[in-house]
Amino acid sequence: LMRAIAGAHPPHAGRVKLDGTDITSLPAHTRVRRGIALVPEGRRLFAGLTVEENLRVAAASRTGGRWNVQAVLEVFPFLKPRLHMPAATLSGGEQQAVAIGRGLMTNPRLLLLDEASLGLAPVAVDAVYRSLADVIREGMTVLLVEQDLGRALKVADRVVCMLEGRVVLEGEARSLDRDRIVNAYFGLRRAAAGGTGA
């Protein structure tokens, strides 16, 4: 889903629309210019480049806006002492912060964030999610794919639970709880497998 929205993968069916405009046929680089930034699972930084260089790479695709290196460092202050260090020397949480910062450097209207907590120590996840909450409070639209339901529910306004390309539950985050989401996802999966699910 995320890669289809970003233009990195063609959708199998349907259309991709941004503000009511069909962008399905637009290449990924054009979608970036239109305001879509993807922070993929696995971070995918340039290991030999410094933190600052990794951030500035994304600035080439930048549209006008608030996000620059200084603004990213305000949201992720733990990156300041690492600014001139190679990305390969960073912890997983620091790398994830750089990846999110790189997405922000394009000044997107829509930030696609795939599995922000994957493979991170709990303390790193805490730091990333504190900063992500700040980004959202500033008005950034974030589409977050996350298996850590507790954390996702704390930052989300709206939740859409999908299974095999179909929406199985959606609603305002404050009206949904973990059990309801888990039941929708796993209950439907058990039913599809011939079990006694919901």
What are these regions (language model features)?
Residues 1-198:
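Glycine-rich phosphate-binding loops of nucleotide-dependent enzymes
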